[in-house]
Amino acid sequence: MKYTSYFLAFQLCVILGSSGSYCQAPFFKEIQNLKEYFNASNPDVAGGGPLFLEILENWKDESDKKIIQSQIVSFYFKLFENLKGNQIIQRSMDIIKQDMFQKFLNGSSEKLDDFKKLIQIPVDDLQIQRKAISELIRVMKDLSPRSNLRKRRRSQNLFRGQRASK
C-alpha cells in the first residue's frame, strides 16, 4: 500500500504540474515530502503503468477532461482523508489539498462543500441506492446536451419572433 500511495502522490505532482506548479517551491517541496514518505524511488512503484496519466492523455476536449479530472481529484481527496491524522505528512497533504481546491474548484468553498458531500455518499447504503435510482431520470435529463440545445433554440426562436413582429 505504501508504494501505491507514493506513486499516487507522484502522479498528483505531474497532474497538477501544469500552469507552473513545479516552479512553486512550497508546493513542490510538499510533493517531495510525500515522495520521501512513500519511498517513491523504489522501481516497483512504476509496475503496471501509470494510474491516471494515460487516461488524461486520451481525453482532449477541455469539458470532457474536467469530468475525468473530477474523478481523479475525488480519488486524491479520499486518499488524503484516509491518511488524515498522520502527523508526518499532514502539513504536506493540507497544502496540496488547498492547491487542488484553488485549481480545480476555483477557490469556491460552496463547490468544495458540494464536492466533499458527493464523494462521501456511501454506495452500499440501501436508502441511498433507492434515492439515487429515484433521481436517475432527472440526472440523465440534466446530463443530456440535447435538452440544453432545445432550450437555446426555443429562446432564439422567441427572440427572432419578437424582432419580426416589430
From Swiss-Prot:
One of its GO terms (biological process) is astrocyte activation. Released primarily from activated T lymphocytes. The lineage of its organism: Eukaryota, Metazoa, Chordata, Craniata, Vertebrata. SUPFAM superfamilies: 4-helical cytokines. It comes from Tursiops truncatus (Atlantic bottle-nosed dolphin). One of its GO terms (molecular function) is cytokine activity. Type II interferon produced by immune cells such as T-cells and NK cells that plays crucial roles in antimicrobial, antiviral, and antitumor responses by activating effector immune cells and enhancing antigen presentation. Primarily signals through the JAK-STAT pathway after interaction with its receptor IFNGR1 to affect gene regulation. Upon IFNG binding, IFNGR1 intracellular domain opens out to allow association of downstream signaling components JAK2, JAK1 and STAT1, leading to STAT1 activation, nuclear translocation and transcription of IFNG-regulated genes. The gene is IFNG. Residues 1-23 form the signal peptide. PANTHER family: INTERFERON GAMMA (PTHR11419:SF0). GO terms for cellular component: extracellular space. Glycans are attached at residues 39, 106. Keywords: Antiviral defense, Cytokine, Glycoprotein, Growth regulation, Pyrrolidone carboxylic acid, Secreted, Signal. This is Interferon gamma. It is found in: Secreted. Its main location: secreted. Homodimer. Interacts with IFNGR1 (via extracellular domain); this interaction promotes IFNGR1 dimerization. The modification Pyrrolidone carboxylic acid is found at residue 24. Belongs to the type II (or gamma) interferon family.
